[in-house]
């Protein structure tokens, strides 16, 4: 039986045509068609949706970057505006404080001048009243001196 199998194998090998690297039979175009079909199927099922997802992702990233840069620009503009408003408000507040200090200083100066004037007038009035009282006291003393002088003279001369 072994001999039969060996002889069959030898017969089989002698009937086959020995080819080179490729055998050009019906399997080669079939493999090419299978490759093209697989490429088309993969393109439709996998690559197009994947490409679409990647494109949408790129578009989303670009839109997000655009929106973020617009928001950053707006935030920078608002920051500059608020800083300018703050600087202007500080300047106005400093001007108001300066004017209030000047007004207060003027009021204090005028009150001091008025108080000094009132004090000078009060001293002048007091000095005048004291002079009047002094004159009256001197006149009273002169009268009393005259009366006492007359009484002393009468007592001395009359005795």
UniProtKB/Swiss-Prot annotation:
A Pfam family it matches: ATP-synt_B
Keywords on record: ATP synthesis, CF(0), Chloroplast, Hydrogen ion transport, Ion transport, Membrane, Plastid, Thylakoid, Transmembrane, Transmembrane helix, Transport
GO molecular function: proton-transporting ATP synthase activity, rotational mechanism; proton-transporting ATPase activity, rotational mechanism
GO cellular component term of the entry, any: proton-transporting ATP synthase complex
Transmembrane segments: 30-47
Localization per Swiss-Prot or TrEMBL: Plastid, Chloroplast thylakoid membrane
Bilayer topology term: Single-pass membrane protein
Signal found in the keyword field: no
More details: In plastids the F-type ATPase is also known as CF(1)CF(0).
Quaternary structure note: F-type ATPases have 2 components, F(1) - the catalytic core - and F(0) - the membrane proton channel. F(1) has five subunits: alpha(3), beta(3), gamma(1), delta(1), epsilon(1). F(0) has four main subunits: a(1), b(1), b'(1) and c(10-14). The alpha and beta chains form an alternating ring which encloses part of the gamma chain. F(1) is attached to F(0) by a central stalk formed by the gamma and epsilon chains, while a peripheral stalk is formed by the delta, b and b' chains.
Family statement drawn from the similarity comment of this UniProt entry: Belongs to the ATPase B chain family.
UniProt cross-references to NCBIfam families, sorted A to Z: ATP_synt_b (TIGR01144), PRK07353.1 (NF005607)
Function: F(1)F(0) ATP synthase produces ATP from ADP in the presence of a proton or sodium gradient. F-type ATPases consist of two structural domains, F(1) containing the extramembraneous catalytic core and F(0) containing the membrane proton channel, linked together by a central stalk and a peripheral stalk. During catalysis, ATP synthesis in the catalytic domain of F(1) is coupled via a rotary mechanism of the central stalk subunits to proton translocation. Component of the F(0) channel, it forms part of the peripheral stalk, linking F(1) to F(0). The b'-subunit is a diverged and duplicated form of b found in plants and photosynthetic bacteria.
Protein name (database record): ATP synthase subunit b', chloroplastic
Organism: Antithamnion sp. (Red alga)
């Amino acid at each position: 039986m072994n001999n039969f199998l060996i002889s069959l194998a030898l017969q089989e090998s002698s009937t086959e045509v020995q080819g080179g690297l490729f055998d050009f039979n019906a399997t080669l175009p079939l493999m090419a068609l299978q490759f093209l079909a697989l490429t088309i199927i993969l393109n439709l099922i996998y690559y197009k949706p994947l490409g679409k997802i990647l494109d949408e992702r790129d578009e989303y990233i670009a839109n997000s970057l655009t929106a973020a840069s617009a928001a950053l620009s707006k935030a920078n503009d608002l920051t500059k505006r608020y800083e300018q408003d703050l600087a202007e408000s500080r300047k106005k507040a400093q001007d108001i404080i300066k004017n209030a200090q000047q007004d207060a200083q003027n009021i204090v100066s005028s009150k001091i001048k008025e108080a000094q004037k009132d004090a000078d007038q009060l001293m002048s009035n007091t000095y005048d009243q004291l002079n009047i009282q002094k004159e009256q006291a001197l006149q009273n003393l002169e009268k009393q001196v005259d009366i006492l002088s007359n009484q002393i003279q009468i007592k001395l001369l009359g005795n």
